[in-house]
Every structure is written in structure tokens, then in C-alpha cells.
Amino acid sequence: MSDNPTIAPKIVVVGAGAFGTALAAVAAASANANVTLLSRREEVAEECRRTGRNERALPGIALPAGLGFSSEAAALAGADIVLFAMPSQEHRAAAQQYGTAIGADATIVTCAKGMEQSTGRLLTELLAEELPGHRIGVLSGPGFAADIAKGLPTAMVVAAPDMAVATELAEALSGPTFRLYPSTDRIGVQLGGALKNVLAIACGIVEGAGLGDSARAALISRGLAEMSRFIAARGGEADTVRGLSGLGDLVLTATSHQSRNLRFGIALGKNGRADGRGAELVEGAFAASVAARVAGDLGIEMPITEAVAAIIDGKLDVRTALEQLMSRPITQE
């Protein structure tokens, strides 16, 4: 990032989906940065330039006049901050595609909530492999794209290797209606974002199956315990789960029908079993199988996550999974 605080940082958001567009809009609206939204498709960039909107991703929302649009990797030249806002499973390919265009001094921030399915890598780990030498951060927490883009009050977390970098990122990306809290727990912040998607699917299953609000409350509370164990086992801070990137994001995603993960779970609950449709569209479907596999390798128990993974994979139906969860040995909370 720029060493001169009087110079507005250059920010490039890679990925013109709903969340990337929203982040670019809120950063541009703050008037404290030079912001470009980089789409991998020229027709999307051209539509945004021509109409001042991204109707494919955020219909009906006008974008700030100062926001730039591009489909060329050259837009990354001189960027101080690069936000990777594409889905988690596309991060490695994007890093390989754009890596040579990103300057050595740029700080790279992943804004996706997942893990790489094939390796179980956290996205910061993946980016560090593909883009060595860069400072790598993560932005996560409870924020729907439409809310952010509409200027509704939203608070999230940005984590980086040290607090100075995290604070710089928070100051550069925050605006009047968008507040970022700095953190150094990249592991905890990432896993909170990834695992809450799995638990949102579980809560959706409960809702779709008509199992009641008490069951949802149990899933949220016991799910937080699973998240805490997993974060600690992966080297993060267990207490991070109590903050915005853990509890905050879980409550939002597990209770709002804006959540794709919740809606996917509701469909599973209504059907009673997986039907092979929709799993490729939700981050939680990838995270469930990865987290269950890694938990086994780490020797930690994650029964809710394992049940969700088994339901999505078609190995269990909802009723059998519920019976197995409810018949587990009684232990102290």
C-alpha cells in the first residue's frame, strides 16, 4: 500500500459478482480511493460502463459514478489493494491468471468464504502459494451484497498477518455505512466464514423439514462449538468464533432467506434427501465435505458438519441423520 497517506489508494476488485460489485461500490462511494471493478467478461464490464449498473449481479442498484470498470488484467497495474471476490473454488485459477499483473507491493485480500475442495487449503494459504511475497489478508463477516451496495449499515472483519496491515486495510475499505474491524487471526476469520455456511445449510434443513425453532437454536449453539474446535485445531484463536466473522455471520446466514446456503438447506429438508441440484452454487456444500475430511485428519468431532456432508453426498437422508445426531452419547456441554 502507498506510503503516502495523502494519496488515495488504488483498489481493484477482481470478480464482478454480487459481493465483488458491492465491495467495489462501497469503496468507491467513500471517495477515499481509486476503485476499479475487474470482470473476467468484457460484456459485463461494458454493461456496467454503459448503464452504471450491474444488473446481472445486483439488479436495480445504481453504482457510484467514480467506480471504474475493466476486463483487462492491465487494470491491476499499480494497485495497492487487490480484492479477490470470486468463489473460493476459482481462487487458484484467478491467482494464476492475474498474478503477473499484480505489483509486488500490492496487498491481496480474499473475500470468499470457503476452502479449496481438492486440498483443504485456506484461501490465504492458497494465495500465498500462488502469489509468494505478497501480504495476504481476508475480509469476512455478516454482510449480504445487496445490503452493502444499498448503503445499509454493515460491519465486517478484515484480518492480515499483523495489526498494522489489517488497520490500513480497514481504514482504506471502510465507509460511512460500511465498517471493518481489524484482526490478525486470519485462520479464525476464514474458518468462521466457511463453517457458518455449513451450519446455515443445517439450519435450512431443519426449517425445510419443519423441525422447529428449538432445533435451529440447538444447531447454532452446538455448531459454534464445532467451529471453535476446528479453528483451534487449525491454529486459529477459538475466541474469534464469538465475533463478527463467527457468531455474527452465522446468525445472519442461518436466519435470513437472502442466504443461498439457507435456501439450499431448506430444499434439502423439504425433499428429505439430496437430489443433486444446487450444491455447486453454494459455498457451504464445498465446505461441508472439506471440513468433514480435515476434521477426521485432525481427530476432532464435528457431528453436525459430518451429517450435512453426508446428506449432500447422498449417503444419509435427513431423518436418519437427525436420528444419529440425537442418539449420540450424552456429554457435558
From Swiss-Prot:
- Mind telling me which Pfam families this protein's record contains? NAD_Gly3P_dh_C, NAD_Gly3P_dh_N
What superkingdom does the record give? Bacteria
Any idea which positions bind NADPH?
19, 40-41, 113, 145, 260, 282-283
Q: Which family does it belong to?
A: Belongs to the NAD-dependent glycerol-3-phosphate dehydrogenase family.
EC number of the protein: 1.1.1.94
The catalytic residues are: 196
Q: In which pathway does it act?
A: Membrane lipid metabolism; glycerophospholipid metabolism
| The organism of origin for this protein | Sinorhizobium fredii (strain NBRC 101917 / NGR234)
Q: Which UniProt keywords apply?
A: Cytoplasm, Lipid biosynthesis, Lipid metabolism, NAD, NADP, Nucleotide-binding, Oxidoreductase, Phospholipid biosynthesis, Phospholipid metabolism
Set out the biological process GO terms recorded for this chain's protein.
Answer: carbohydrate metabolic process; glycerol-3-phosphate biosynthetic process; glycerol-3-phosphate catabolic process; glycerophospholipid metabolic process; phospholipid biosynthetic process
What functional role does this protein have? Catalyzes the reduction of the glycolytic intermediate dihydroxyacetone phosphate (DHAP) to sn-glycerol 3-phosphate (G3P), the key precursor for phospholipid synthesis.
| Major localization listed first in the record, in broad terms | cytoplasm
- Could you state a single Gene Ontology molecular function term? glycerol-3-phosphate dehydrogenase [NAD(P)+] activity
Binding positions (sn-glycerol 3-phosphate): 113, 141, 196, 249, 259-261
The reactions it catalyses are: sn-glycerol 3-phosphate + NAD(+) = dihydroxyacetone phosphate + NADH + H(+); sn-glycerol 3-phosphate + NADP(+) = dihydroxyacetone phosphate + NADPH + H(+)
What Gene3D superfamilies does the annotation carry?
Answer: N-(1-d-carboxylethyl)-l-norvaline Dehydrogenase, domain 2, NAD(P)-binding Rossmann-like Domain
The entry's protein name is Glycerol-3-phosphate dehydrogenase [NAD(P)+]
Entry GO terms, CC: cytosol
The subcellular localization recorded is: Cytoplasm
